[in-house]
Design a protein with these regions (language model features):
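Metal-dependent amide/peptide-bond hydrolase catalytic core
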Residues: 2-39, 43-89, 98, 282-290, ...
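Acidic/His- and Gly-rich active-site-bordering loop/insert found
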Residues: 23-26, 30-31, 47-211, 230-239
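Sec-exported extracytoplasmic/periplasmic mature domains
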Residues: 108, 112-116, 141, 145, ...
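Solvent-exposed loop/turn segments at secondary-structure junctions
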Residues: 117-118, 170, 181-184, 248-252, ...
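Loop/turn elements at helix/coil->beta-strand transitions in domains of secreted/extracellular proteins
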Residues: 171-174, 237-241, 271-274, 509-511, ...
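Short beta-strand segments
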Residues: 178-180, 277-279, 538
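Short pre-catalytic strand/loop immediately N-terminal to key active-site residues, enriched for Gly-Thr
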Residues: 204-215, 514, 554-555
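Acidic/histidine-rich catalytic neighborhood of metal-dependent amide-processing enzymes
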Residues: 207, 212-293
């Protein structure tokens, strides 16, 4: 795919194998010249990409840009030009206590329906635990009557939902809005730790509590609320609007988004959507400024399975190291051999740093100086900019570093029997500019050392069946390269400029919009072929409630102000996209 092409090409390498000794010295000098030239090209490209300002967009009916040189240009707030009395009344209703009260009831009702997904779920149709989605679908149909009356509603693989709001101009690429219906489980052991029961949907006067309230039934309900309101106001779209709601995002999405995306692809074709918005990064206070950081990329992903087979026997006559001991040694080596911090030239976090340097009053001076120097830094050198930025904590560190986490381990069946088979699973989130194959090669190298030390055979990603006295390495089927980076140009009208303008229209021009990157993966990983404009963004913002709403843990909740703002944003974005003329 074109989106996967790097902004900056790889540096040329010199050939250190020569047939004639007489030419070695000359070739070495030429290699040095090429390396210097490559660095010069790299400097120029980085300068052009991040320093040379984008031309201001001639926005016409939608708004204007700041006419100034900028490393992080901001668009003016974007307000739809087409207004009717009904739409004006809708906007007023969105600000009213009456709407807030009804919105509380809608989200609370959705939270009260248990839609947990589990790692060991079988196929749809075989595992009855999927049936929790039937009452959820009934609730949606009852709660949003206009949506179900006017939009085409289709079910994919039984529980996946696709809504089509047909536009009047079939030549325009559709807008796709996404969310997922499922939630992570609530362990029984944690039930007593909840302030309010996880399926209560309790509203305490400020926040709605319960599993899924912030991940991400709030986004799903907000999307449907915005469409319901627009229908009630008589809005008729010119550009088709699609809604796609998966049901197993929390367990990698294979049966949900993994079937929804091909369904949409078959109907519309490759690169057929103008924009995709799914759950993701949001709005927070950074370096003394309020910053919206829609995710324009995601890290890659691979799980490596390590299996060690060694002879069993009675525990009273053990070897120096059992299979568990050998596995422990290998895991220790894996965890000790960290991946380097590297801020690749196409990593969106680099753009976020430039936005901070330009617009944030509390941006660290040392980071700013390193940011200037980074324009001339070759990849071969230690990345001092990444190292300094990583001091902000692990959440920032792993935006620029491949992560390794040994998350699953098992082996041994009895206390007096030597373990014959031990298995561990190592999760990797792959940094921008790197590849899952790099992680496979790295673990293979460490496993080779351990296998040699203990006289074990090594089967390294070769699809070989396990054998006695061996270490076997394999990868789960789900291996993902880092996502293509969504364009963030505001030169002319673009998906990014419409998204940015919608954010600033709702929250004010003091909010800075900067590109973001996700350390985790969303359902969008199945949708890459449908659009180059994919944003992972949670548009709700409170200003008083911080953090991520306790997603995936006890006391998950979302403020009603955050939720209402999510509804406001989607109703605004749908209308702004309807007037956009870039695709």
């Amino acid at each position: 795919m074109d989106e996967k092409q790097q902004l900056i090409g790889s540096l040329p390498t010199t050939n250190d194998s020569f047939e004639q000794r007489a030419h070695a010295k000359k070739s070495s000098r030429w290699g040095t010249v090429k390396l210097i030239a490559a660095c010069a090209v790299l400097v120029a490209l980085l300068h052009w990409t991040f320093v040379v300002p984008k031309l201001p967009m001639k926005h016409g009916k939608h708004g204007k840009h700041h006419h100034q040189k900028s490393q992080c240009p901001q668009v003016e707030p974007l307000v739809p030009s087409q207004q009717t009395d009904e739409l004006v009344n809708m906007d007023a209703y969105l600000k009213s206590p009456a709407f807030q009260n009804s919105s509380i009831q809608r989200l609370s009702g959705a939270v009260q329906i248990d839609t947990q997904s589990f790692d060991d779920l079988g196929k749809v149709g075989d595992d009855k635990r999927w049936e929790v989605f039937y009452p959820f679908h009934e609730y949606l149909e009852k709660t949003f009557p206009l949506v179900y009356e006017h939009l085409k509603v289709e079910k994919v693989n039984t529980h996946g939902l696709v809504y089509t709001w047909q536009g009047s101009d079939a030549k325009l690429k559709p807008t796709l809005l996404m969310a997922h219906q499922d939630t992570v489980p609530v362990p029984d052991a944690t039930l007593d730790a909840w302030t309010h029961p996880p399926w209560s949907g309790f509203f305490d006067g400020k926040e709605i509590w319960g599993r899924g309230s912030s991940d991400c039934k709030n986004q799903l309900i907000a999307i449907l609320e915005s469409v319901e309101l627009l229908l009630d106001a008589g809005f008729v779209p010119t550009r088709t609007v699609l809604l796609s709601f998966g049901f197993d995002e929390e367990i990698s999405g294979g049966q949900g988004a993994g079937t929804l995306a091909p369904f949409i692809l078959e109907r519309y074709g490759p690169d057929s959507l103008a924009v995709i918005v799914d759950e993701g990064a949001g709005i927070s206070d950074e370096w003394g400024v309020t910053m919206a950081t829609p995710g324009v990329a995601e890290k890659g992903y691979t799980d490596v399975v390590i299996t060690i087979r060694m002879p069993g026997g009675h525990s009273s006559i053990p070897p120096d190291h059992t299979a568990i001991g050998v596995m422990s040694e290998l895991i220790t080596l894996i965890e000790a051999d960290k991946y380097p911090l590297r801020l690749d030239g196409k990593n969106p976090y680099l753009g976020q740093l430039y936005c901070g340097a330009e617009h944030a009053t509390e941006f660290p001076k040392k980071l700013g100086k390193l940011l200037d120097k980074a324009q001339g830094q070759c990849k071969a050198k230690p990345d001092s900019l990444a190292a300094e930025a990583a001091k902000a904590g692990p959440a920032i560190q792993y935006l620029m570093q491949t992560s390794i986490a040994v998350d699953v381990i098992g082996g041994g069946v009895k206390v007096n029997a030597l373990p014959e088979r031990v298995q561990a699973i190592v999760n990797h989130r792959i940094n921008v500019g790197e590849h899952p194959a790099d992680a496979h090669a790295k673990i293979a190298g460490l496993a080779k050392e351990v296998a040699k030390k203990y006289g074990l055979a090594l089967h390294s990603f070769d699809n070989t069946t396990e054998s006695p006295s061996s270490i076997s390495l394999s990868a789960f089927e789900h291996v993902l390269e880092p996502a293509p980076v969504t364009p963030t140009s505001v030169d002319g009208e673009t998906a990014y400029s419409v998204l940015s303008g919608s954010i600033r229209a709702l929250y004010g021009s003091e909010v800075i919009v900067a590109p973001g990157i996700m350390t985790g993966n969303t359902d969008t990983k199945y949708y890459w072929d449908l659009s180059r404009n994919i944003f992972r963004f949670a548009p709700g913002y409170d200003g008083e409630s911080s953090g991520l709403g306790n997603i995936h843990t006890v006391d998950e909740r979302v403020s009603i102000k955050n939720h209402v703002n999510t509804v406001k944003w989607f109703s605004l974005f749908i209308r702004n996209m309807d007037e956009a003329d870039f695709e």
